[in-house]
Structures are given as C-alpha cells and as structure tokens.
Amino acid sequence: MDNRRLLYSISISLVILVLFQVIASYVLPPPKKAPPHPATQTAQTQPVSGQPAPGVPAPSAVPPAAAPGGVAAKIPAGPRLAISTPLLRGSMSLVGARLDDLVLTRYHQTVKKTSPLVQLLSQAGTAKSYYVQFGWDAAPGSSLKVPGPDTVWTSSGGDLSPAHPVTLSWNNGAGVTFELKLAVDRQYLFTVQQRVINHGAAAVEVYPWSRIRRDFLPEEPGSFTLHKGPIGVFHGTLHEMGYEGVKSGGKHPAAGDAPGTAYQTTNLGGWAGITGKYWLTALIPSQGREVIGAYRYLADPGQPEHGGYQVDYMTAKPVDAAPGATASTTTHVFAGAKVLSILSHYETQYRIPLFERAIDFGWFFFLTKPIFIALDYLAGVFGNMGVAIIVFTIGLKLVLFPLVRTSYRSMARMRAITPKVQALRERYKDDQMQQQKEIMALYKAEGVNPAAGCLPMLPQIPIFFSLYKVIFISIGMRHAPFVLWIHDLSAEDPTNIFNLFGLLPFHPSALSPFLHLGILPIIMGITMWGQQRLNPPPPDPTQAKMMQFMPVIFTFMLGRFAAGLVLYYCVNNTLTILQQWTIMRGTNAAPRAAANLNAKG
C-alpha cells in the first residue's frame, strides 16, 4: 500500500510539472533576450586602459560601433586585407586596422557539413560585433598625431598568409610613420609588431595598446561548470571574470579606475582574452614588458543595461623613438579553437604562462587534464570518440577495481544478511533502540561494516567529476559521431520515445523539456536498475522505497545530457554490474563450500 501511495504521489507530481510547463508556454510570455547591442559613440569615449599609472596618458577613444540609442551603425566601408591559412579564413579592415572577420575552416556551426563555418570575429556594426584592434596614444601634453579609428592604412600588397607577411603603414604628415607588421602561422597565432619610425627632428613618445572588443553575449551563458567571458593570467595567476561580473564591476569601478573598469592591474607579460566553451581570442604581450591589463564594460549611456565587453593592454611605460630611429613592440593574438596540443605548443614556444588553462579544466585540473589527454589519444588511435570513451571507461574500471573490490564485497555480505536484518526489524519493530542494538550486534557477529562499502567509493568522486568535465568541455567531443543514430556526442540523444522515435511528426520537448527521452538514456536507466538490484536495500524502509525510483529519475535527468556522458554511464554501469556479480558469486560460494565440507565431515 505504501509503495502504491508513493508511486501515485510521484506520478501526480510529474503530471503537474509537465502541465505547468505546457500551460506556461501558452499563458506566460517567454522571457525576452536582450538584443545584441553594440556600444554607442558616446560610450566609446572610454579609454583603453582606464586610469593609467603615473606618467601614462589617457588612451584614445574606442572606435565607434553604433549610433546613439543603440541603433547599429553602418558597417564601415573601405579596403580590406584578405587572410588565408589552413585553419583560418577572413579579412582585416584597413579602416582603423581592425581584425574583424575570421572563420574557422575546420569547424561548422552544426553537425551538417554543409552548414556555415564557425564565425569567430565579426565586423563592428553587425549584430555580433567582435574584433581585435591595435593603436597608439601620444604622451601627455604631446601634439603628436597618432592613427585613429577612421585612419585608412596602406597595405604592402597581397594577402596575409603563413608564407606572406604584410605591413600596414600610415604617415601622420609630420615626419612620423606608424606601421603594423602582420604575420600569421599555420594554426591560430598572429604576430603583430607595432612600429613607430621617426623621420623628424624631435624625439617621439607613444604608448602602444591592443584591445579585444565583444558587443554581444553568448546564447548560452557561463555556469558553475564552465567559464565564459574575460580570462587572463596576471602576476602568474589565472583570473576569470564572467560577463555579469564585468558588467557589475564596470558600473562600480574601484577608486582611481576609469568608469567601466571592472578589473585592472600592472604586471609583466601574461595574457588576456575572451573565452567561450570551445573558442578563444587572446592578446599575448611580450613577456618581459610591463603592461597594464584590464577588463571593462562599456555601457550605452542611453541604455546602461546594454554595452560592450573589452579586454585590453597598454604599455605601462612609453616607447621612445629618437630622431631617425624606430621603436617597436610585439603582441601575439590567438584566435581559434581551444585545442590542447596547440595551446601547449604556444605555451612552450613563447613561454606564455598557464596558456593551457584557457581550457576550463576546473578545480580538479590535475585529474581533468590527464583524462583529457587520454581521451584525445584514444580517439586518435581508434578514430572514434565514442569508442575512446568505452575503452577509457574499461581501463578506468580495471585501475580502480582493487579500490572498489572492498566496497563490492561489503555490499555482497550486507545483501547476504539482509533477511536476518529484516527479521530483527520485524521482531523489534516496537522498540527502536533494541532494534538498532540487535542489528549492530548482528553486523559485529557477521564481520560486516556498513560504512566499509562507502569509504572506498569516496576517492572516485573527483575522478568521475573530472571525466564529466572533460566530456562537457572537450572540443574533440564537439560534432563527434559514434554509431547509428548518435551523430554528435556533445549533444543530447536525438531520438525521443515520446514521439515513438520520430514516427510521430512533432517534438514533445517543445511542450516540456522533460518530454525528451532517447534510446541511450533509456539503456542507461536499465543498467542503473540492474546495478541497483545487486546492491543491498537501504536499512530504512522509506529510503529503500525512494531508491526504487532513482533509475527512473536519473533516466529523465540524463535525457538532456550530452550523449557522450550518457554513453559513459551506460558502460560504467554495465561494467559495475559484471564486477559486482562476479564478487557476489565468490562471496556466496565461500559459505556454501564450507557448509559442504562440514556436511561431508
């Protein structure tokens, strides 16, 4: 009767929840997403690096990206420099020297190979304005004319490619030439040398700067398990700040910082940029040069809730060019996919501190990174990330088997004495204290420790969490097929039992997110139920009844999880069943063998 009531309660709760989702979708208006909103001209008067150090000038204004009131400005017309590498394709605007058009040639927006390529950087004035820019500020009190946002640069000719560097130049008409010497490698790294050539009779002092500007939020915000937004290494320490944190900090800057500054510091080298789940755009200054780095939120004065996010660097000390001399600084720009081997290569080659940590390995990075490397290696060996997950899970279970064997043996012994425990509960059901005393005495007599089954499992928790993290963040999992109907291990199982696996022409998940249950989560639920059947029931009857529904609950919970993670649980549960069954057979065989020997004696 109690089981029936519990089942009724859970069923009614699920029905109410689903009905609420359905009714709410029709009655309540859906929340409106804030439109992508480039910052206005007024907002663009924000300096690059906020309040500078003593002797450092206030840098020039950020280039206009929109008209007042939030209406996107016309995309700046003018000449462009084409960019072509094995992994990148795009162009750079010669008006303002903005790197603002870049696609990743190996990654598509959807699993279909005919879908558009991933657009990493986009032009100012578009709905998803996202660009990198370089410039100079003159020293305080100087009348030196420096390039501005509308400056039209002259290219040395040809497209920018790994085999063909390009130089952009501009003469200020007063004897000073500014140059941007651009080079790009075969992967994702640009090298930008900012040169000032002084043909005049007086010395020149300038402050080179670089910035990344993003005027829209990602469709899926960051979460507890994944950071999105500004990221960098300052003073040898990784510093992450989410979009909301930058926005809040920019509205309330620290004393001495310019408006919009959420974080600012002066240090040697390091790196800073804006990261997503799979992609990164980062500025990497010379590691031996003192620079001012900052995260900013540049609000639209007309609509303070809208604005742009900026990461920038400026030299802390001026760069001097004597008459007839040339002064230069070099900055690297990473713009591409967060592939561990590529990040590691750049970290080593250019001595970039903690550059690998652009991948969000999380708290357990000392575990997550080795798992990440192992899965990537296995995927290369077997040619399939799904097979790599299966092989890795088998290997992990074998390595952990000595640790969990104690737990499985304890659970087997607990299951063997379950009838005796139930008998004691029935006998002393009116005397709880005596009941617990007798049960403890039984445990002692049988040599069973209820906690022994749990303690060996504790060290596994960080490992399993790290594996979940890797499956969630690995770019190797993105659009990686497995077999049959699984075409993307980073996405949920596309099948759904509620439309008879595609036979009915509608999408139940449109009514409620709970109405999505694919084949793989169902298999996972079955394996979880089988594993639960081998475990001894909890001593508390109420807890035991609740545990009966855990496979059903987890099946629905994992219905919207990445197929790669569900595949791991399926394999892990199946191997656990085999291990438990083998140990239980051995544990039960020992008493039977002893009984047979006694009978023969």
Swiss-Prot record:
Function text: Required for the insertion and/or proper folding and/or complex formation of integral membrane proteins into the membrane. Involved in integration of membrane proteins that insert both dependently and independently of the Sec translocase complex, as well as at least some lipoproteins. Aids folding of multispanning membrane proteins.
Cellular compartments annotated: Cell inner membrane
HAMAP family: YidC_type1
Top-rank taxon: Bacteria
Gene from which the chain derives: yidC
GO molecular function: membrane insertase activity
Oligomeric and partner information: Interacts with the Sec translocase complex via SecD. Specifically interacts with transmembrane segments of nascent integral membrane proteins during membrane integration.
Name listed for the protein in its UniProt record: Membrane protein insertase YidC
Gene Ontology BP terms: protein insertion into membrane; protein transport
Low complexity: bias regions: 39-53
Keywords attached to this entry: Cell inner membrane, Cell membrane, Chaperone, Membrane, Protein transport, Transmembrane, Transmembrane helix, Transport
Organism for this UniProt entry: Acidiphilium cryptum (strain JF-5)
Family: Belongs to the OXA1/ALB3/YidC family. Type 1 subfamily.
NCBIfam families (alphabetical): PRK01318.1-4, yidC_nterm, yidC_oxa1_cterm
Membrane topology annotation: Multi-pass membrane protein
Transmembrane segments: 10-30, 382-404, 455-475, 510-530, 549-569
Region described as Disordered: 34-63
Compositional bias per record (Pro residues), positions renumbered to this chain: 54-63
GO cellular component: plasma membrane
